[in-house]
Amino acid sequence: MASEAHTRTALIGRWFAWLDRARIAWVAVGDDHAIAAGAGNDVDLLVAPRQLAAIPRLIRRFARANRLRLVQDIQHEAVARFFVLAWEDDDGRPGFLYLDIAGDYWRHGRRFVPVAPVLQRRVRASALGAGGERITYWRPAPADNLLYYLLKKIDKGSLPDAACATLARDWRRDPAGARQALVGYLPSAAVELVAIAVITGRWQPVQRVLPALRDRLATATRLGPPAVAAESMRRVLRCCRPTGLVVQVDESSEADEVARDWAKAFRRVVVVRTDRPPGLLCRLLLIWPQVMATTLVVFASSAATVPGAVRLAASARLRNRALGLHLARRHAMGGGGRYLSLTV
């Protein structure tokens, strides 16, 4: 039986080849070592903006060709979509592949990194996957990858050891280019902190200034009317097409198993153990906001039916299959919305 990491890296290699056959201009950004290892991280891709509209259709075709289920399609930015593809292993448990695909790199309605120069400087690279297979992909120039990855970590407010190693590796490949890339986004003092951290291996000073850098980035770019309109439309669509789900099982142990197996397909999981169905006010004020925030709400209740919940069987294999099919049907018609075109 192939491990989940082995299956994931094989699928990543096929997806990259699928993009090339479709003549999509793309690049894989971030920690390419983790991608090749099938570590379960998001596969972050930047795509030529004019080709973004073709991506959802390609995803669905790829899923059908590889017997996968598209279980999440989340538009987390006006020009960025997060897809989760699922498969079933020999034990009936789900495995997941995460694809985060965007045009220009946007966060909170602001454009951080335009993708056109990144695609112009991309290079072909390869790495060995978890099962020994060779994965070929497009990689950004070192300075471009460092800029993208550092901005993403600043925005998240977290810089773990693996991320520090990736940043140091890219800086050493092109020190002058890395310094020049950061100067346009970070204060000179912060750029020097990164340069010193690469040499010394001590990233604590950089980690301490992450909150200040995050605040600076959040206010550095003014939102023009097109960006405001696109961000507003995205928020409306997220409310109309919630990406969370409410399910119900009979036993508390079954709820824990559902939470364990499907946590990676949602942003959060909440388990509710009760013998009384939630009232209308509870559903509107407590449950519905969770569902809009991509939360899986699992009710363990055999005494009453939870309104609007998907009832799952007692068998783990049947539970996982039914939940996967339900999510796949929800996205079969491309219900996650469209990439929005921005002119800024």
Please give the residue ranges for each predicted region:
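Conserved beta-strand segments of alpha/beta enzyme cores
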Residues: A25, V270, R338-L340
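NTP-dependent small-molecule kinase module
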Residues: L210-R238, P307-V344
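Flexible, charged surface loops at secondary-structure boundaries
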Residues: L19-R21, A39, R93, C239-R241, ...
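A short acidic (Asp/Glu
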Residues: A37-N41, D256-E257, P307
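Glycine-rich phosphate-binding P-loop
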Residues: L245-K264
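Conserved NTP-donor binding/palm subdomain of two-metal-ion nucleotidyltransferases/polymerases, i.e.
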Residues: M1-N41, V47-L245
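Structural motif
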Residues: P49-R50, A102-D104, Q248-S252, R273-P277, ...
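Conserved nucleotide-sensing/catalytic segment adjacent to the nucleotide-binding pocket
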Residues: R267-V310
